[in-house]
From Swiss-Prot:
Function field: Essential for the activity of NADP photoreduction.
Compartments reported by the entry: Plastid, Chloroplast thylakoid membrane
Cellular component GO terms, alphabetical: chloroplast thylakoid membrane; photosystem I
Keyword Transmembrane: no
GO terms, biological process: photosynthesis
Primary site of residence: plastid
Gene responsible for this protein: PSAM
Organism placement in taxonomy: Eukaryota, Viridiplantae, Streptophyta, Embryophyta, Tracheophyta
Keyword line: Chloroplast, Membrane, Photosynthesis, Photosystem I, Plastid, Thylakoid
Identification of the protein by name: Photosystem 1 reaction center subunit 8
Amino acid sequence: IQADXPTFQVIQDDN
């Protein structure tokens, strides 16, 4: 998982 992009933020937002 890359925390340098919006992808990580989306995963955290899902929680």
